[in-house]
Protein backbone atom coordinates (compact mmCIF):
# COMPACT_ATOMS: atom_id res chain seq x y z
CA UNK A 1 0.00 0.00 0.00
CA UNK A 2 2.80 2.42 0.91
CA UNK A 3 4.61 1.67 -2.36
CA UNK A 4 1.47 2.38 -4.36
CA UNK A 5 0.93 5.64 -2.50
CA UNK A 6 4.49 6.81 -3.19
CA UNK A 7 4.11 5.81 -6.82
CA UNK A 8 0.95 7.92 -7.10
CA UNK A 9 2.65 10.93 -5.53
CA UNK A 10 5.60 10.72 -7.93
CA UNK A 11 3.33 10.40 -10.96
CA UNK A 12 1.35 13.42 -9.80
CA UNK A 13 4.34 15.77 -9.68
CA UNK A 14 4.47 18.56 -12.31
CA UNK A 15 6.54 17.88 -15.40
CA UNK A 16 8.80 20.84 -14.56
CA UNK A 17 10.19 18.85 -11.62
CA UNK A 18 11.98 16.53 -14.02
CA UNK A 19 13.23 19.34 -16.25
CA UNK A 20 14.30 22.08 -13.84
CA UNK A 21 13.88 20.75 -10.33
CA UNK A 22 11.36 23.55 -9.71
CA UNK A 23 8.50 23.46 -7.26
CA UNK A 24 5.94 24.84 -9.73
CA UNK A 25 5.27 24.17 -13.38
CA UNK A 26 7.00 26.22 -16.06
CA UNK A 27 4.59 28.82 -17.55
CA UNK A 28 3.10 27.74 -20.86
CA UNK A 29 4.64 30.59 -22.87
CA UNK A 30 8.10 30.14 -21.35
CA UNK A 31 11.01 27.73 -21.55
CA UNK A 32 12.65 26.52 -18.35
CA UNK A 33 16.04 24.88 -18.06
CA UNK A 34 18.21 23.66 -15.25
CA UNK A 35 21.16 25.84 -14.27
CA UNK A 36 23.48 25.85 -11.32
CA UNK A 37 21.54 26.21 -8.07
CA UNK A 38 18.12 26.49 -9.70
CA UNK A 39 16.42 27.05 -13.03
CA UNK A 40 16.39 29.67 -15.76
CA UNK A 41 13.05 30.90 -17.11
CA UNK A 42 12.94 32.40 -20.60
CA UNK A 43 9.73 34.16 -21.60
CA UNK A 44 11.16 36.64 -24.11
CA UNK A 45 9.22 37.43 -27.31
CA UNK A 46 6.25 35.45 -26.01
CA UNK A 47 3.58 38.12 -26.64
CA UNK A 48 2.82 38.41 -22.93
CA UNK A 49 0.65 41.30 -21.73
CA UNK A 50 1.09 40.51 -18.03
CA UNK A 51 3.56 38.73 -15.82
CA UNK A 52 2.81 34.97 -15.68
CA UNK A 53 0.80 34.15 -12.58
CA UNK A 54 3.00 31.29 -11.46
CA UNK A 55 6.75 31.24 -11.86
CA UNK A 56 9.04 28.47 -10.64
CA UNK A 57 10.03 29.33 -7.10
CA UNK A 58 13.53 27.93 -7.71
CA UNK A 59 14.13 30.38 -10.57
CA UNK A 60 17.46 32.19 -10.43
CA UNK A 61 16.99 34.06 -13.72
CA UNK A 62 13.84 35.31 -15.50
CA UNK A 63 13.86 36.89 -18.95
CA UNK A 64 10.70 38.77 -19.96
CA UNK A 65 12.29 40.91 -22.69
CA UNK A 66 10.35 42.12 -25.73
CA UNK A 67 6.81 41.52 -24.58
CA UNK A 68 3.85 43.88 -24.15
CA UNK A 69 3.93 44.42 -20.39
CA UNK A 70 2.47 47.80 -19.42
CA UNK A 71 2.05 47.70 -15.65
CA UNK A 72 3.67 46.06 -12.65
CA UNK A 73 1.50 45.78 -9.54
CA UNK A 74 2.64 45.19 -5.98
CA UNK A 75 4.56 41.92 -5.59
CA UNK A 76 4.25 41.43 -9.33
CA UNK A 77 6.45 38.32 -9.23
CA UNK A 78 5.22 36.74 -6.04
CA UNK A 79 7.85 35.32 -3.75
CA UNK A 80 10.96 34.04 -5.50
CA UNK A 81 13.60 33.61 -2.80
CA UNK A 82 16.36 32.45 -5.18
CA UNK A 83 15.91 34.97 -8.01
CA UNK A 84 19.12 36.87 -8.81
CA UNK A 85 18.51 38.25 -12.29
CA UNK A 86 15.33 39.80 -13.76
CA UNK A 87 15.14 41.35 -17.22
CA UNK A 88 12.18 43.40 -18.47
CA UNK A 89 13.82 45.23 -21.38
CA UNK A 90 11.92 46.38 -24.47
CA UNK A 91 8.41 46.27 -23.02
CA UNK A 92 5.76 49.01 -22.82
CA UNK A 93 5.95 49.67 -19.10
CA UNK A 94 4.42 53.00 -18.14
CA UNK A 95 4.08 52.55 -14.37
CA UNK A 96 5.71 50.45 -11.68
CA UNK A 97 3.82 50.27 -8.40
CA UNK A 98 5.96 50.88 -5.29
CA UNK A 99 6.74 47.45 -3.87
CA UNK A 100 6.48 45.71 -7.25
CA UNK A 101 9.74 43.90 -6.55
CA UNK A 102 8.99 42.85 -2.99
CA UNK A 103 9.41 39.14 -2.49
CA UNK A 104 12.74 39.12 -4.38
CA UNK A 105 15.19 39.34 -1.46
CA UNK A 106 18.23 38.07 -3.39
CA UNK A 107 17.77 40.04 -6.62
CA UNK A 108 21.18 41.29 -7.76
CA UNK A 109 20.50 42.47 -11.32
CA UNK A 110 17.43 44.32 -12.63
CA UNK A 111 17.12 45.38 -16.26
CA UNK A 112 14.40 47.86 -17.21
CA UNK A 113 16.04 49.42 -20.27
CA UNK A 114 14.11 50.51 -23.37
CA UNK A 115 10.76 51.09 -21.73
CA UNK A 116 10.21 54.43 -23.42
CA UNK A 117 6.84 55.12 -21.81
CA UNK A 118 8.09 54.78 -18.24
CA UNK A 119 9.28 58.39 -17.78
CA UNK A 120 8.51 58.45 -14.04
CA UNK A 121 9.64 56.37 -11.08
CA UNK A 122 8.25 56.56 -7.54
CA UNK A 123 10.77 57.12 -4.76
CA UNK A 124 10.05 53.62 -3.36
CA UNK A 125 10.03 51.76 -6.65
CA UNK A 126 13.05 49.70 -5.61
CA UNK A 127 12.25 49.32 -1.93
CA UNK A 128 13.44 46.08 -0.30
CA UNK A 129 16.09 45.33 -2.96
CA UNK A 130 18.92 45.53 -0.47
CA UNK A 131 21.15 43.16 -2.47
CA UNK A 132 20.73 44.79 -5.88
CA UNK A 133 24.13 45.35 -7.51
CA UNK A 134 23.24 46.27 -11.12
CA UNK A 135 20.37 48.50 -12.26
CA UNK A 136 19.69 49.25 -15.92
CA UNK A 137 17.38 52.21 -16.63
CA UNK A 138 18.75 53.08 -20.08
CA UNK A 139 16.50 54.55 -22.77
CA UNK A 140 13.43 55.02 -20.58
CA UNK A 141 13.05 58.71 -21.52
CA UNK A 142 13.30 59.74 -17.88
CA UNK A 143 13.39 63.51 -17.31
CA UNK A 144 14.33 63.15 -13.66
CA UNK A 145 14.26 60.69 -10.79
CA UNK A 146 13.43 61.25 -7.10
CA UNK A 147 16.33 62.14 -4.83
CA UNK A 148 15.60 59.07 -2.68
CA UNK A 149 15.10 56.62 -5.54
CA UNK A 150 18.35 54.72 -4.90
CA UNK A 151 18.62 55.36 -1.17
CA UNK A 152 17.47 51.81 -0.30
CA UNK A 153 20.03 50.18 -2.59
CA UNK A 154 23.13 50.05 -0.38
CA UNK A 155 24.77 47.29 -2.45
CA UNK A 156 24.39 49.04 -5.82
CA UNK A 157 27.63 48.84 -7.83
CA UNK A 158 26.62 49.67 -11.40
CA UNK A 159 24.00 52.09 -12.72
CA UNK A 160 23.18 52.36 -16.43
CA UNK A 161 20.99 55.39 -17.09
CA UNK A 162 22.15 56.49 -20.55
CA UNK A 163 19.84 57.62 -23.36
CA UNK A 164 17.54 59.49 -21.00
CA UNK A 165 16.51 63.16 -20.81
CA UNK A 166 18.28 64.28 -17.62
CA UNK A 167 19.41 67.92 -17.68
CA UNK A 168 21.62 67.45 -14.64
CA UNK A 169 23.39 64.59 -12.94
CA UNK A 170 20.62 62.89 -10.93
CA UNK A 171 20.79 63.81 -7.27
CA UNK A 172 19.84 60.21 -6.49
CA UNK A 173 23.48 59.26 -7.09
CA UNK A 174 24.76 61.26 -4.15
CA UNK A 175 25.87 59.19 -1.22
CA UNK A 176 25.96 55.82 -3.02
CA UNK A 177 29.04 54.71 -1.16
CA UNK A 178 29.45 51.42 -3.05
CA UNK A 179 28.74 52.63 -6.60
CA UNK A 180 31.67 51.83 -8.91
CA UNK A 181 30.28 52.41 -12.43
CA UNK A 182 27.88 55.12 -13.61
CA UNK A 183 26.78 55.35 -17.25
CA UNK A 184 25.02 58.65 -17.99
CA UNK A 185 25.96 59.17 -21.63
CA UNK A 186 23.78 60.43 -24.50
CA UNK A 187 21.49 62.63 -22.44
CA UNK A 188 20.94 66.37 -21.99
CA UNK A 189 23.11 67.02 -18.95
CA UNK A 190 24.37 70.62 -19.05
CA UNK A 191 26.80 70.81 -16.13
CA UNK A 192 28.70 68.81 -13.55
CA UNK A 193 28.18 70.74 -10.34
CA UNK A 194 30.45 70.65 -7.32
CA UNK A 195 27.82 68.63 -5.45
CA UNK A 196 26.79 66.27 -8.26
CA UNK A 197 29.08 63.41 -7.26
CA UNK A 198 29.29 63.83 -3.51
CA UNK A 199 29.93 60.69 -1.53
CA UNK A 200 30.89 58.51 -4.53
CA UNK A 201 34.12 57.44 -2.91
CA UNK A 202 34.34 54.09 -4.70
CA UNK A 203 33.40 55.30 -8.17
CA UNK A 204 35.88 53.92 -10.71
CA UNK A 205 34.19 54.67 -14.05
CA UNK A 206 32.01 57.63 -15.03
CA UNK A 207 30.64 58.21 -18.52
CA UNK A 208 29.10 61.59 -19.35
CA UNK A 209 29.89 61.51 -23.05
CA UNK A 210 27.54 62.86 -25.71
CA UNK A 211 25.58 65.17 -23.41
CA UNK A 212 25.38 68.98 -23.48
CA UNK A 213 27.88 69.69 -20.73
CA UNK A 214 29.11 73.29 -20.92
CA UNK A 215 30.61 73.57 -17.45
CA UNK A 216 32.52 71.44 -15.00
CA UNK A 217 32.60 73.20 -11.65
CA UNK A 218 35.72 73.36 -9.51
CA UNK A 219 35.94 70.38 -7.18
CA UNK A 220 33.24 68.44 -9.02
CA UNK A 221 35.26 65.21 -8.75
CA UNK A 222 36.61 65.91 -5.28
CA UNK A 223 35.06 62.80 -3.69
CA UNK A 224 36.05 60.51 -6.57
CA UNK A 225 39.61 59.82 -5.51
CA UNK A 226 39.68 56.27 -6.93
CA UNK A 227 38.17 57.19 -10.31
CA UNK A 228 40.01 55.39 -13.15
CA UNK A 229 37.99 56.22 -16.28
CA UNK A 230 36.32 59.59 -16.99
CA UNK A 231 34.56 60.17 -20.30
CA UNK A 232 33.55 63.77 -21.06
CA UNK A 233 33.88 63.60 -24.82
CA UNK A 234 31.38 65.01 -27.32
CA UNK A 235 30.04 67.77 -25.12
CA UNK A 236 30.16 71.60 -25.34
CA UNK A 237 33.11 72.35 -23.07
CA UNK A 238 34.99 75.50 -24.09
CA UNK A 239 36.89 75.93 -20.82
CA UNK A 240 37.83 73.99 -17.70
CA UNK A 241 38.72 75.26 -14.23
CA UNK A 242 42.38 74.93 -13.31
CA UNK A 243 41.63 72.31 -10.66
CA UNK A 244 38.98 70.43 -12.63
CA UNK A 245 40.71 67.07 -12.11
CA UNK A 246 42.51 67.74 -8.88
CA UNK A 247 42.89 64.67 -6.68
CA UNK A 248 42.25 62.12 -9.45
CA UNK A 249 45.59 60.45 -8.88
CA UNK A 250 44.37 57.03 -10.03
CA UNK A 251 42.82 58.22 -13.28
CA UNK A 252 43.95 56.08 -16.23
CA UNK A 253 41.64 57.29 -19.04
CA UNK A 254 40.47 60.86 -19.65
CA UNK A 255 38.46 61.61 -22.78
CA UNK A 256 37.88 65.28 -23.60
CA UNK A 257 37.55 64.80 -27.34
CA UNK A 258 34.83 66.43 -29.40
CA UNK A 259 34.45 69.59 -27.32
CA UNK A 260 35.20 73.28 -28.00
CA UNK A 261 38.49 73.68 -26.10
CA UNK A 262 40.89 76.15 -27.73
CA UNK A 263 43.91 75.58 -25.50
CA UNK A 264 45.49 73.09 -23.13
CA UNK A 265 46.36 74.48 -19.69
CA UNK A 266 49.27 73.25 -17.64
CA UNK A 267 47.21 73.01 -14.45
CA UNK A 268 44.62 70.58 -15.80
CA UNK A 269 46.71 67.42 -15.62
CA UNK A 270 49.00 68.23 -12.70
CA UNK A 271 47.67 65.39 -10.50
CA UNK A 272 47.24 62.76 -13.22
CA UNK A 273 50.52 60.89 -12.88
CA UNK A 274 48.85 57.51 -13.56
CA UNK A 275 47.09 58.65 -16.74
CA UNK A 276 47.55 56.24 -19.66
CA UNK A 277 45.12 57.50 -22.32
CA UNK A 278 44.40 61.18 -22.95
CA UNK A 279 41.98 62.21 -25.70
CA UNK A 280 41.96 65.86 -26.77
CA UNK A 281 40.97 65.20 -30.37
CA UNK A 282 38.26 67.06 -32.33
CA UNK A 283 38.51 70.32 -30.42
CA UNK A 284 39.68 73.76 -31.58
CA UNK A 285 43.00 73.67 -29.75
CA UNK A 286 45.54 76.11 -31.16
CA UNK A 287 47.86 76.46 -28.17
CA UNK A 288 49.40 74.10 -25.62
CA UNK A 289 50.92 75.69 -22.53
CA UNK A 290 54.50 74.94 -21.57
CA UNK A 291 54.70 71.85 -19.39
CA UNK A 292 51.07 70.88 -20.02
CA UNK A 293 51.99 67.18 -20.29
CA UNK A 294 55.09 67.17 -18.11
CA UNK A 295 53.64 65.01 -15.31
CA UNK A 296 52.17 62.38 -17.63
CA UNK A 297 55.13 60.02 -17.48
CA UNK A 298 52.94 56.92 -17.80
CA UNK A 299 50.99 58.11 -20.86
CA UNK A 300 50.56 55.42 -23.52
CA UNK A 301 48.65 57.51 -26.07
CA UNK A 302 47.96 61.21 -26.55
CA UNK A 303 45.32 62.17 -29.12
CA UNK A 304 45.64 65.72 -30.46
CA UNK A 305 44.28 65.03 -33.93
CA UNK A 306 41.54 67.16 -35.45
CA UNK A 307 42.50 70.50 -33.91
CA UNK A 308 43.95 73.85 -35.09
CA UNK A 309 47.54 73.28 -34.02
CA UNK A 310 50.27 74.75 -36.19
CA UNK A 311 53.15 74.08 -33.82
CA UNK A 312 53.80 71.87 -30.80
CA UNK A 313 56.79 72.83 -28.69
CA UNK A 314 58.93 70.27 -26.91
CA UNK A 315 58.54 72.33 -23.74
CA UNK A 316 54.95 71.08 -23.56
CA UNK A 317 56.40 67.74 -22.44
CA UNK A 318 59.49 68.80 -20.51
CA UNK A 319 60.80 67.80 -18.06
CA UNK A 320 58.85 64.57 -18.50
CA UNK A 321 59.76 61.88 -20.99
CA UNK A 322 56.86 60.88 -23.19
CA UNK A 323 57.02 57.24 -24.29
CA UNK A 324 53.56 56.76 -25.77
CA UNK A 325 52.01 57.17 -29.19
CA UNK A 326 51.18 60.66 -30.40
CA UNK A 327 48.28 61.25 -32.81
CA UNK A 328 48.61 64.56 -34.65
CA UNK A 329 46.84 64.21 -38.00
CA UNK A 330 44.23 66.71 -39.24
CA UNK A 331 46.03 69.79 -37.97
CA UNK A 332 47.37 72.68 -40.12
CA UNK A 333 51.01 72.09 -39.15
CA UNK A 334 53.66 74.72 -39.90
CA UNK A 335 56.67 72.52 -40.62
CA UNK A 336 59.43 74.99 -39.75
CA UNK A 337 62.33 74.63 -37.33
CA UNK A 338 59.97 74.61 -34.35
CA UNK A 339 58.96 71.08 -35.37
CA UNK A 340 62.45 69.79 -36.06
CA UNK A 341 62.46 68.02 -32.70
CA UNK A 342 59.25 66.24 -33.65
CA UNK A 343 60.64 65.17 -37.04
CA UNK A 344 63.72 63.73 -35.31
CA UNK A 345 61.55 61.96 -32.76
CA UNK A 346 59.37 60.49 -35.51
CA UNK A 347 62.47 59.00 -37.11
CA UNK A 348 63.88 57.69 -33.86
CA UNK A 349 60.82 56.32 -32.07
CA UNK A 350 58.30 55.35 -34.73
CA UNK A 351 55.55 56.40 -32.34
CA UNK A 352 54.33 59.35 -34.40
CA UNK A 353 53.03 59.14 -37.96
CA UNK A 354 50.92 61.24 -40.29
CA UNK A 355 51.89 64.86 -39.58
CA UNK A 356 50.82 66.68 -42.77
CA UNK A 357 52.41 70.07 -43.46
CA UNK A 358 50.18 73.02 -44.38
CA UNK A 359 53.05 75.53 -44.53
CA UNK A 360 55.63 76.87 -45.46
CA UNK A 361 54.71 76.74 -49.12
CA UNK A 362 57.78 74.77 -50.20
CA UNK A 363 56.78 71.78 -48.03
CA UNK A 364 52.97 72.12 -48.06
CA UNK A 365 51.39 68.76 -48.75
CA UNK A 366 54.39 66.79 -47.50
CA UNK A 367 54.50 64.78 -44.30
CA UNK A 368 56.80 66.17 -41.63
CA UNK A 369 58.91 63.03 -41.93
CA UNK A 370 59.75 64.06 -45.52
CA UNK A 371 60.95 67.57 -44.64
CA UNK A 372 64.70 68.29 -44.72
CA UNK A 373 65.86 71.21 -42.60
CA UNK A 374 68.87 73.18 -43.81
CA UNK A 375 71.69 74.53 -41.67
CA UNK A 376 73.23 77.97 -41.55
CA UNK A 377 76.98 78.54 -41.48
CA UNK A 378 76.90 78.49 -37.68
CA UNK A 379 74.90 75.25 -37.57
CA UNK A 380 71.48 76.67 -36.80
CA UNK A 381 68.30 75.25 -38.33
CA UNK A 382 67.01 77.08 -41.39
CA UNK A 383 63.26 77.18 -42.06
CA UNK A 384 61.95 75.87 -45.40
CA UNK A 385 61.12 78.65 -47.85
CA UNK A 386 57.69 80.22 -48.02
CA UNK A 387 56.85 80.08 -51.72
CA UNK A 388 55.20 83.08 -53.37
CA UNK A 389 54.04 81.92 -56.77
CA UNK A 390 53.46 85.46 -58.05
CA UNK A 391 57.04 86.67 -57.45
CA UNK A 392 59.04 83.47 -57.56
CA UNK A 393 60.62 84.02 -61.05
CA UNK A 394 64.24 85.33 -60.91
CA UNK A 395 63.68 87.96 -63.64
CA UNK A 396 60.91 89.52 -65.72
CA UNK A 397 59.03 86.93 -67.69
CA UNK A 398 59.03 87.29 -71.50
CA UNK A 399 56.06 89.18 -72.81
CA UNK A 400 53.57 87.05 -74.73
CA UNK A 401 53.73 87.47 -78.51
CA UNK A 402 50.13 88.54 -78.76
CA UNK A 403 50.73 91.36 -76.29
CA UNK A 404 53.83 92.56 -78.15
CA UNK A 405 52.04 92.57 -81.49
CA UNK A 406 49.10 94.47 -80.08
CA UNK A 407 51.42 97.09 -78.59
CA UNK A 408 53.27 97.45 -81.94
CA UNK A 409 49.96 97.81 -83.78
CA UNK A 410 48.84 100.42 -81.28
CA UNK A 411 52.01 102.37 -81.88
CA UNK A 412 51.45 102.26 -85.65
CA UNK A 413 47.90 103.43 -85.17
CA UNK A 414 49.12 106.44 -83.26
CA UNK A 415 51.75 107.24 -85.90
CA UNK A 416 49.28 106.92 -88.76
CA UNK A 417 46.45 108.73 -87.01
CA UNK A 418 45.69 112.20 -88.46
CA UNK A 419 46.54 115.23 -86.48
CA UNK A 420 43.53 117.09 -85.27
CA UNK A 421 43.25 120.51 -83.80
CA UNK A 422 43.71 120.79 -80.06
CA UNK A 423 40.14 121.96 -79.62
CA UNK A 424 38.76 118.90 -81.40
CA UNK A 425 40.98 116.51 -79.47
CA UNK A 426 39.83 118.01 -76.21
CA UNK A 427 36.22 117.21 -77.04
CA UNK A 428 36.87 113.54 -77.81
CA UNK A 429 35.08 111.21 -75.31
CA UNK A 430 36.61 108.22 -73.60
CA UNK A 431 34.43 105.88 -75.58
CA UNK A 432 36.17 106.88 -78.82
CA UNK A 433 39.46 105.48 -77.51
CA UNK A 434 38.29 102.01 -78.58
CA UNK A 435 37.36 103.04 -82.14
CA UNK A 436 39.18 101.17 -84.92
CA UNK A 437 41.65 102.80 -87.27
CA UNK A 438 39.40 102.27 -90.27
CA UNK A 439 36.47 103.90 -88.45
CA UNK A 440 38.64 106.92 -87.70
CA UNK A 441 39.79 107.22 -91.30
CA UNK A 442 36.38 106.85 -92.84
CA UNK A 443 34.69 109.26 -90.48
CA UNK A 444 37.26 112.03 -90.77
CA UNK A 445 38.42 111.78 -94.43
CA UNK A 446 42.00 112.29 -93.31
CA UNK A 447 44.65 114.15 -95.31
CA UNK A 448 42.87 114.77 -98.64
CA UNK A 449 42.47 112.56 -101.68
CA UNK A 450 46.10 112.70 -102.81
CA UNK A 451 47.47 111.07 -99.64
CA UNK A 452 44.90 108.31 -99.09
CA UNK A 453 46.26 105.48 -101.35
CA UNK A 454 49.78 105.21 -99.85
CA UNK A 455 48.36 105.85 -96.40
CA UNK A 456 45.91 102.95 -96.69
CA UNK A 457 48.58 100.68 -98.16
CA UNK A 458 50.91 101.39 -95.23
CA UNK A 459 48.18 100.80 -92.70
CA UNK A 460 47.49 97.37 -94.21
CA UNK A 461 51.08 96.17 -94.65
CA UNK A 462 52.84 97.47 -91.54
CA UNK A 463 50.93 95.33 -88.96
CA UNK A 464 51.93 92.20 -90.89
CA UNK A 465 55.53 93.36 -90.99
CA UNK A 466 55.36 94.04 -87.25
CA UNK A 467 54.28 90.47 -86.53
CA UNK A 468 57.25 89.09 -88.46
CA UNK A 469 59.63 91.41 -86.62
CA UNK A 470 58.29 90.41 -83.22
CA UNK A 471 58.41 86.72 -84.10
CA UNK A 472 62.02 87.09 -85.16
CA UNK A 473 62.91 88.80 -81.89
CA UNK A 474 61.31 86.05 -79.86
CA UNK A 475 63.16 83.34 -81.77
CA UNK A 476 66.42 85.10 -80.95
UniProtKB/Swiss-Prot annotation:
InterPro entries (UniProt xref): Cys-rich_flank_reg_C, Leu-rich_rpt, Leu-rich_rpt_typical-subtyp, LRR_dom_sf, LRR_TM_domain-containing
Keyword S-adenosyl-L-methionine (UniProt): no
LRR repeat extents: 60-84, 85-108, 110-133, 134-157, 159-181, 182-204, 205-228, 229-252, 254-276, 277-300, 302-324
Glycosylation sites (chain numbering): 92, 178, 295, 388, 427, 434
Superkingdom of the source species: Eukaryota
Record SUPFAM superfamilies: L domain-like
Any one of the GO BP annotations: visual perception
Record-annotated LRRCT domain positions: 336-387
Transmembrane spans: none
GO cellular component terms, A-Z: extracellular matrix; extracellular space
SMART domains (alphabetical): LRR_TYP, LRRCT
Pfam families per record: LRR_8
Protein keywords: Congenital stationary night blindness, Disease variant, Extracellular matrix, Glycoprotein, Leucine-rich repeat, Proteoglycan, Repeat, Secreted, Sensory transduction, Signal, Vision
Subcellular location: Secreted, Extracellular space, Extracellular matrix
Signal peptide as annotated in the record: 1-18
Keyword Glycoprotein listed: yes
Tissues showing expression: Expressed in kidney and retina. Also at low levels in brain, testis and muscle. Within the retina, expressed in the inner segment of photoreceptors, outer and inner nuclear layers and the ganglion cell layer.
Involvement in disorder: Night blindness, congenital stationary, 1A: A non-progressive retinal disorder characterized by impaired night vision. Congenital stationary night blindness type 1A is characterized by impaired scotopic vision, myopia, hyperopia, nystagmus and reduced visual acuity.
Family of the protein in this entry: Belongs to the small leucine-rich proteoglycan (SLRP) family. SLRP class IV subfamily.
Record-given protein name: Nyctalopin
Source organism of this protein record: Homo sapiens
Name of the gene encoding the protein in the UniProt record: NYX
Amino acid sequence: MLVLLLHAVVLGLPSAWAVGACARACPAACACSTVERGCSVRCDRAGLLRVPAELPCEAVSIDLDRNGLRFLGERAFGTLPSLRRLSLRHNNLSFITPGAFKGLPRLAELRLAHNGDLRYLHARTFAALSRLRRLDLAACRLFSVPERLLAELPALRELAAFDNLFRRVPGALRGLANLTHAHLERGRIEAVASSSLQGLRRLRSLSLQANRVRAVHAGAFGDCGVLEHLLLNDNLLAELPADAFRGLRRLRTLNLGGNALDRVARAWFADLAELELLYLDRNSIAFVEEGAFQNLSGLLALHLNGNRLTVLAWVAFQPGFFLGRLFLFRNPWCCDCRLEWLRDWMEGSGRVTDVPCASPGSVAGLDLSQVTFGRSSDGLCVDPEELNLTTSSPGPSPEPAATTVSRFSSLLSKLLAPRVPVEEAANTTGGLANASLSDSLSSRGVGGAGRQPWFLLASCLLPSVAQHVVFGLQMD
